[in-house]
Amino acid sequence: MTEADFKIRLFFLVQITNGVFVDFLASVWRHEKSRAVLLQVIVIAAVFGSFGWLISNLVTNFAALNKNFGFDFLFQPAGYDINQRLIEYTNRSTHIRAAVVGLLNTALVAIVGIVLATILGVILGIIRLSNNWLARNVAYWYIEFSRNVPILLHILLWHGIIINTMPHPKKAIAVGDFLFLSNRGLFLPQPIAEVGIAALYLAIVAAFAFVFFFSRYAKKLQRETGRQLPVSIINFIVLISLPLLAFLASGSPVSLDLPALKGFNFRGGMHLMPEFVALTFALSIYTAAFIAEIVRAGILAIHKGQREAAEALGLRPGRVMSLVILPQARRVIIPPLTSQYLNLTKNSSLAIAIGYMDLVATLGGITLNQTGREIETMLLVMSIYLIISLSISVAMNWYNSSVKLVDR
């Protein structure tokens, strides 16, 4: 075979192969499911290719800067103080300890903020539908003002109010001899665990476990037989009596460290910084405005015949709302409510604007600046916020599945 014959045969072979390949692609593209699979394969390949390019670029740049990738810096001394801490911490503690302190501060703001925003949002959502003209319009203007002002301005406003208008410690707003509010923050009694605290913890866990399983049993019994049990009364008695009995039997395993004014400030007790109070108020008030509209929409989604039927049975308006309207409205309220909880948690990262030492201020701020580990610290911050958000979503999805209608 001459070289010319070989080239001719190779040319025809390539043409035939290309034709077969083109026909194959055309047949795949015409088939809907095959086309979907092909597009997904292309997208996945592009994503992994881009990710691989980023990793390669990162390694090259790290080598050029004579830096290495790792998390060993977390075990080095932090060398800075944190103004509010829920666990023991000093400037000699490690960076990972500082990150945990910041994470707990973030979690504290998120939990307290979610509770306050939910309570305020539900109340405002109901008031928005009130027949009282003044109450309805006050709630309306509050919601419109809060929703249309950036959250950062809310935070700065409340911080300025607390710092500049709250009294000095000597003239602090007092509730009895155990709670004080001043421009230095909020001072509360701090519980101190003593010998026998394990029995109290066990009793609390057992009480909540009883409430959970008894409530499910009572609901199942009512659904199958129509018999109603006094669930609220029994649960309340168990929640109070079981821990109380354990407390008394263990010889008072918890003591209180009360705050007391000494000199120019309070000493002892639990100290919540003014930054925490301002941040929590701002996030709660801002998010409550959105929750109020969600609650209002959920109530309006319930057919008016439900209210009319309940009123025809002689139920008072408050009982109609709590027993008939809100239980049904939950199915509409919960999905968007989850988004607001996530927004509140993520908005707490703005705490750095007023000096509250949360996760972003500790791990994503001072630790980053001291160690120069930008990639590692940001990856950790992003991962932690992702875990928190997924945890909230899982909890709310579980609650949503427990209240949704079940098809028979």
Regions found by a protein language model. Give the residues of each.
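Intrinsically disordered, low-complexity regulatory regions of eukaryotic regulatory proteins
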Residues: 1-3, 21
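N-terminal amphipathic/hydrophobic targeting modules at extreme N-termini
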Residues: 3-12, 150
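Transmembrane alpha-helices and adjacent helix-loop boundaries
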Residues: 16-408
